[in-house]
Structure formats: C-alpha cells, structure tokens
C-alpha cells in the first residue's frame, strides 16, 4: 500500500481485505508486498466468483493466521501456493472450507509443524483429488 507521502507502508494485517468481493473473477497480486504481514485470515472469504489465483510470489514468512483465508470460494478452480511459507502459521482452520470447485492446488512447500488449530481445512472440497507422491514416516 502507498501512503499519502508516496512511500510504501508496512502492512501487518490483510484479514478480510477482499472478503465478499462477489464479482471478483481474477486478481493479479504478483507485486503485492506481504513481507510484514502477520494475519491473512478471511482474506478472500466469500469471493464466490473467483476462479483462479496465483499467490506464489507472496512472502509469508511472518504470517501466523490463515484461517478461513479461502472460505466459501465456491468457483475457485486453481490455486497456486507453491512458495507459501507456512512455518510460522498457528491458525489454519477452515482454510479451504467449501471450495467445492477446487481441482488444482499446489501446497508443495506447506509446513504444518507449528499449526495449533487446523480443523476442517478441506471441508467440502469435493472436487479436489488428493495425490500423495511421497509419504514420510518420522517415527
């Protein structure tokens, strides 16, 4: 974000930023500065017309809360979170709740070791086919 003086502000809270943007079908966030963001909860909540989203350029190293981030994005088909750094995330509940059209989801760098709340992450993601390429047993 740019403030009145023309310099970039250090945003920490992006919660509800695009929530209920029902007419939004696509969005280019490739140049969004997210390096200081801590909270992304409900960010795309109820964006029911959103079809595809690429957040691979998001810097999420400080994010702790992503609960309900894509809640009820019922038209979302493709989502790229391939570089999403989730090592500090503690709240992940309902992350993809009711993303019933989602068929392509890249979570290749997700780390859930610090997550404390993770219920219903994929609730009603009926179109999503899970393919586990590698299962690691750390017993």
Role assignments for model-derived ranges:
Residues 1-139:
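Negatively charged
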């Amino acid at each position: 974000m740019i403030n009145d003086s023309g310099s970039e502000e250090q945003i920490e809270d992006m919660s509800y930023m695009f929530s209920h943007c029902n007419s939004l079908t696509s969005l280019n966030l490739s140049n969004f500065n997210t390096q200081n963001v801590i909270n992304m909860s409900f960010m795309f909540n109820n964006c029911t017309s959103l079809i595809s989203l690429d957040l691979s350029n998001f810097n999420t190293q400080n994010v702790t809360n992503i609960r309900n981030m894509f809640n009820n994005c019922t038209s979302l088909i493709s989502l790229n979170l391939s570089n999403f750094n989730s090592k500090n995330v503690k709240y992940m509940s309902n992350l993809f709740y009711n993303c019933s059209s989602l068929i392509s989801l890249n979570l290749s760098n997700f780390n859930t070791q610090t997550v404390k709340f993770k219920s219903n992450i994929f609730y009603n993601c009926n179109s999503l086919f899970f393919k586990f390429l590698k299962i690691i047993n750390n017993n």
